[in-house]
Structures are given as structure tokens and as C-alpha cells.
């Protein structure tokens, strides 16, 4: 049995949250290695942003790696200094560098001026803690797109219990059957309302 996740659906919601949060009308997407799976994250994110405001600029860059954290840091640095204030990363270990860059940058800013990162595959909020220049304990993870692997395991074991083990089938998990989701993390009430509506 194999499972596929409709990552573009949770990425779309991340795009809505980003578009409702950006102060610069400029956001970014960093992918690992271009493939159908990662492109689905990118396109979903872009569509979500566009649904809120088609004039928001979305920078897109691929690292050509899933492990090069240094590359992630360099790309994030260029995007942030180019005016993007939120980056969604779907890039494995490359994403670690994006978090590092956001932390370094945010420690030089007042809390109100922080830049954001959107987490991927699991809730990454705990990786976004920092102390701002004006001495505030804060967090820069706006939201996280989730693969709800636990729900999939539950679903397959329930099917098995009912003698309906889906051997050889490809099971598709999306927002409707709770296979993917968006963790709210630090999304504002207004932005979260837009996410709920977009669902």
C-alpha cells in the first residue's frame, strides 16, 4: 500500500496565510530539487498567494539539493534582503539554513519588524524561537504545512480491521480526509480566518 499527499492543498493555505501577513507584498519559496512533488508545493503556494492578492511578488528558487543548509541560508539571505518578509521552504535539510538566516536576521530587528518562515511536513514552530533586538522573546514560524502520517496509519489499520486492507492500492490523502493540514503557529486571527474560508 502506498500513500500520496495532496501537498499542494496545504501549500495553498500557506500561501493564503502568507499573503494576509506580508507587509512588503513580497514573499518567497525555496525548494530542494525540482520534481513533481516539490513543484506541487510551489504551485499551491503561488496560487494561494494569488487568490488573496495577485500583485504580491513571489520569488521562487531551487537549491538543487535537499541537504545543503549553507545554500538555504544564502538563498534566504538574498530573498530577505531583496524585500521578501516570508519564506516557505520545502527543501529538507536546506530548510535548516533558512531557519538559521531568519534567526540571525531577526535578532538584529525589533520584534515588530521580524521576517517569517513557513514550516513544512511537520510542525516546525519550536525551531523559530528567538530574542529580538528590543529584548522580546518571540517566534518567527508563521505556520507549518503538515503531512498527517498518524491519520494515515490509523486509516490503514481501520481498513485492515474491517478486512479491507488496501493492498496494492495508492491511497490519496488531502485536506478533506485530514491527510494534510496547516498548523496555525503564529498566524494572526485575520489571516487565519482567510485560511479557514479557503479550506
For each predicted feature, which ranges?
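A residue-level marker of the well-folded mature domains of exported/periplasmic proteins
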Residues: 1-199
Amino acid at each position: 500500500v502506498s500513500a500520496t499527499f495532496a501537498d499542494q492543498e496545504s501549500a495553498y493555505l500557506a500561501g493564503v496565510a502568507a499573503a494576509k501577513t506580508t507587509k512588503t507584498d513580497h514573499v518567497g519559496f525555496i525548494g530542494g530539487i525540482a520534481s513533481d512533488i516539490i513543484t506541487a508545493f510551489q504551485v499551491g503556494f503561488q496560487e494561494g498567494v494569488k487568490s488573496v492578492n495577485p500583485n504580491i511578488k513571489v520569488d521562487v528558487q531551487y537549491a538543487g539539493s535537499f541537504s545543503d543548509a549553507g545554500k538555504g541560508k544564502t538563498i534566504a539571505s538574498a530573498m530577505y534582503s531583496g524585500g521578501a518578509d516570508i519564506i516557505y521552504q520545502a527543501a529538507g535539510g536546506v530548510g535548516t539554513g533558512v531557519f538559521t538566516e531568519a534567526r540571525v536576521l531577526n535578532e538584529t530587528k525589533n520584534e515588530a519588524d521580524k521576517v517569517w518562515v513557513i514550516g513544512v511536513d511537520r510542525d516546525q514552530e519550536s525551531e523559530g524561537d528567538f530574542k529580538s533586538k528590543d529584548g522580546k522573546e518571540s517566534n518567527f514560524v508563521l505556520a507549518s504545512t503538515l503531512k498527517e502520517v498518524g491519520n494515515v496509519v490509523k486509516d490503514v489499520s481501520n481498513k485492515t480491521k474491517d478486512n479491507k486492507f488496501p493492498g496494492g492500492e495508492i491511497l490519496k490523502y488531502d485536506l478533506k480526509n485530514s491527510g494534510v493540514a496547516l498548523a496555525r503557529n503564529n498566524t494572526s486571527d485575520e489571516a487565519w480566518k482567510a485560511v479557514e474560508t479557503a479550506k
